[in-house]
């Protein structure tokens, strides 16, 4: 039977702290905890942040409030070449967020402090305010509530996440079969993923489902490099192992290696993991090269050879991370020793 962690299904509401924070009329904590008795009519309202719900409540506030001032954050990422098909969506957002409404003002200067009469920004401007609405979104918890949760190998969730939470798709963790997390704030997508996993177990008459260590590692490494892609309801299930009992653990190596690239040899530290793919019958391995590599070598070739001890395997440098590390992958016998029944199938 599969279980879902109810305690971790939501992140906590993210509040910002300002200098000299003082009560200035009815301050509304967050847009996620809306007070239905709050009447914005005739009030001077400040909206701090523009979370995902901003397109809905800013437009409604501007209909009756005396004024609405939105204090926005600086862009965290600049994207060039926005697809043309988003033009209609952008127009809709501009209308709903009040970008084209005369009663809505936008303050781009950073907030310096809350005063007895309103908000003072870093440019010295005092903004009179009767109420504040925090649209600062969610801060996902960095640990689970039940630190005593024990997995199949006797490892607690606290030990498994010693360096921070790393669930696959935000719902599954290697070493904790039949157990799912729903952390939020997009609980609907996570719930659909869990339901698909349970349907897969039912179709295959399996009693156990567990995400592969390699899939979890690659997912979390890539999640740090680029914006997350939408999860397709029919996709992602190939990252799970199905069985009626405990399966062989993915093989993992963390240590020294020699990388041969463009005719040059480099002593590097790597962390590699892999699994035998039941569909194509090949062993797929991948991981991280933690040492920096010369740009001149990378411009000449991406194909490489990775050697660990007396074992060598063809590899490919797939991408470079912002931290100077490189992702490496290969198909076939890996450069590290494997144990268990799977080692005979290479």
UniProtKB/Swiss-Prot annotation:
Pfam families: DUF4873. Transmembrane segments: none annotated. One of its GO terms (cellular component) is plasma membrane. Residues 321-346 are annotated as: Disordered. Disulfide bonds: none annotated. InterPro entries: DUF4873, FAD-bind_Monooxygenase_sf, FAD/NAD-bd_sf. This is Uncharacterized protein Rv0943c. It comes from Mycobacterium tuberculosis (strain ATCC 25618 / H37Rv).
